[in-house]
Amino acid sequence: MEVLRVELPLAPVERLLRKAGASRVSEDAKVELAKAIEEYAMQIGKKAAELAKHAGRKTVKVDDIKLALREL
């Protein structure tokens, strides 16, 4: 059996799926969605960090996140 590692806790991922209408959620489904969320968050974070650096800052601000979301 493959060991699946994700950074996000799976309980909130399951809650999101249930809120979206799922009555039951497999462990694999939780892990797969968590991996997708992490990947998207990394893309946003990298873009936001680039924007902060371009602005001459080391600190990522909320406006960097908002702009990164619009650009992705």
UniProtKB/Swiss-Prot annotation:
It comes from Archaeoglobus fulgidus (strain ATCC 49558 / DSM 4304 / JCM 9628 / NBRC 100126 / VC-16). It is found in: Cytoplasm; Chromosome. Residues 24-26, 58-61 are annotated as: Interaction with DNA. GO terms for molecular function: DNA binding; protein heterodimerization activity. Binds and compact DNA (95 to 150 base pairs) to form nucleosome-like structures that contain positive DNA supercoils. Increases the resistance of DNA to thermal denaturation (in vitro). Keywords: Chromosome, Cytoplasm, DNA-binding. Homodimer or heterodimer with another histone. Dimers then assemble into higher oligomers, with the DNA wrapped around the protein core. This is Probable archaeal histone A1-1. InterPro entries: Archaeal_histone_HMF (IPR050947), CBFA_NFYB_domain (IPR003958), Histone-fold (IPR009072), HmfB-like (IPR050004). Belongs to the archaeal histone HMF family. GO terms for cellular component: chromosome; cytoplasm. It holds the Pfam family CBFD_NFYB_HMF. Its main location: cytoplasm.
